[in-house]
Amino acid sequence: MNRILSKGPRGLNGLLRACPSNFGRSFLCRSTYNVNSRTFWSAPRLRSEDSPSSSQPLKPDPNDGNGNTHRTTSTASSQHTPWYLQEETPIDESRQISSRDQIPELPENSPAILPVLLDYVFKDLGLDELRLLDLRGLETPPPIGANAIMIIGTARSVKHLNVSADRLCRWLRSTYKLTPYADGLLGRNELKIKLRRKARRARVASRAGTTVDEKDDGITTGWICVNAGVVENSPVGEQASRKVEGFGNIVGGTRVVVQMFTEEKRAEVDLEGLWLATIERDRRRRQVSIDTKSDAPHEEVRASTPVQNSSSDHVFGLHSRSSAILPLEQRRGLHSKCRLLGPQTEDNQDDGLDDGLDMSPDSNSTGTDHLAANRTCDKEVATDSLLEHLSGLPDDEALSELGAGQEDTDSTPFLRRFYDALSQMSAEEAAVAQVKLLCTAISRHHLGYSKESLWKAFTTCNYHTYFISDELGIEIVSAMLTALPARQGGPKATGVLPEADRELALRVLEHLSLRGTDILNMKVFHLLYKAASHPTNLSGEEVVKDVTGTTKDRPTSRVAKLIETLDIQFDPEEARKLMMSMFRNEDYDGFWKLWSKLPLNGSPRTSADYEMLFRLHAELGDERRARDCVSTWAPIMSREHPPIPLRGQVVQHIMYCILIAEPAIDRMATAGSTSNLALIWNDCKNNAPARG
């Protein structure tokens, strides 16, 4: 046996063929071992076992007389390229992306951020079945805002939904400095905490042998709306009519909204189906309107009298002028302001109209009548002129012109002219003018005009979708936050602002915020700060002090912290007003913070700022603060850019502060004192204006 096996493969193969099989068949002829039956060669192997072409034997070259194949196989082996060096054939991107996972096409005039946003949502966030809806052409703006583009995508799970929305908000903030808002988004830790609590409740219930109530716990909402806001500020042409349906004002720019769903929630809501139906209805409505206008016959309008063109019309190609006779021989012309009509066109019931122009305080009724005498001007401009003139009058005269109250319409020349102009206005213009009158009267502390009537007029304008500008909206808030006058409720009621008035002001601010008005600015927060400084009742508010003697937990301090936390855009004019309010409210730290921010925000301190600084310290009368203020800031005046000269009213206020800090400063300076206050006192005396 050993001799047979030692003969190599030939002996083994013969043995296998000769062995009978117990199963009725012989063994396979091919051995299970990979035995190479070829003889040993010193040359390379003819065929590679790993090569795909090894199954076909190489044929000798017929031109070779000796039939030598060694040379041919050597050449083929040298030309063989291994698999790891072969270049892969590039696969078309359209084959890689299925039909349900493709980036939608961009609409016309799309913002520059849209293709980048779609690419990020598709590739980085991994949302599937993206759908883009262009809602900019809708006649009725959607609740999410006008000129909106909506992107709808599907997330793979609830966790993927929350993570994608969070990453998208962070990407928009960091890359494009936007302020997106994700409605329905749970924070990174909030979702983990809720899931952990839910699992804990399930374990406790299982131990007790009960089941957990499967009600909506707010975790698996399956829908997150990421509103990126206005991504491109493009001017929108002002429409002729402001009577539009929908929410908010007509704003410029395009806003982008990304709607993220889970697969089940998207099928349940079918948001794209709802919006596609709305877009189709709007398209049909527009088509019907176009067809109606095209089918309507064109009416030909001709003048009743012959038209005679002037020579200037032939030269410049202008439109022909009509020879219609204007009433009372009135002629139109181009003027910088409205032209006064003749005395024959005025109402003779007011005696003050024939007395000429006298804008002195003694003849304010004549000036009021003069401002309303321009009958050829637009009535809205006339009411604005009347209100502007009223705001320039002293308080006593303004209260006299406003009459007895809101029901009074003809007791004064101002009211007669104002309501006469209202009678010739449209309903929208009259309602807005009435709101302006109420704001002016309430700000002047007129007892006949209530804040409830102003709120009613404001809600009426909103109900009829009348246009109220942002400036008028802030003016309404300012009127709502006007404190009660000193004569109402006795001397102790000075500066009292009831809680009901604050609530009305906050409701107005909430409405302005919902329609898109920017209320996070220093002007609004200055109004809130002044309102917080007033007590809500006659007894006042108890001031809580800590062990150091400083006040804490005051409403004004909370508003100041809110201003600092929100990092509101710096407004130099409103910042100076807020500084004065903070100083008079004993918030000295807030005052100095804003004072130091003036030059850092591109608003250098001026002579008026230093005049305000020293005047406030002189009115305060605190010896220590007056000394520190003069010693620190009087020398810095010459170091400002540009330098502040030591002259004018600022010199008087500095001297008052020095007298508060050191009453005997004049004697000390005369005696030759070299103290800091004495040197500043001498400089002020040298630059003080001479008294005649």
UniProtKB/Swiss-Prot annotation:
Primary role: Probable mitochondrial mRNA stabilization factor.
Region (Disordered): 44-83, 286-314, 338-373
Residue ranges, compositional bias (Basic and acidic residues): 292-302
Parts forming coiled coils: none
The protein's name in its UniProt record: ATPase synthesis protein 25, mitochondrial
InterPro entries from the UniProt entry: Atp25, NT_sf
Keyword Ribosomal protein tagged: no
Membrane topology type: Peripheral membrane protein
Biased composition (Polar residues): 65-81
Primary gene name: atp25
A Gene Ontology term for the protein's cellular component: mitochondrial inner membrane
Major site of localization recorded for this protein: mitochondrion
Biological processes annotated in GO: mitochondrial gene expression; mRNA stabilization
Protein family (similarity comment): Belongs to the ATP25 family.
Transmembrane stretches, start-end: none
UniProt keyword terms in alphabetical order: Membrane, Mitochondrion, Mitochondrion inner membrane, Transit peptide
Cell location: Mitochondrion inner membrane
Residue span of the annotated presequence: 1-73
Bias (Acidic residues): 347-357
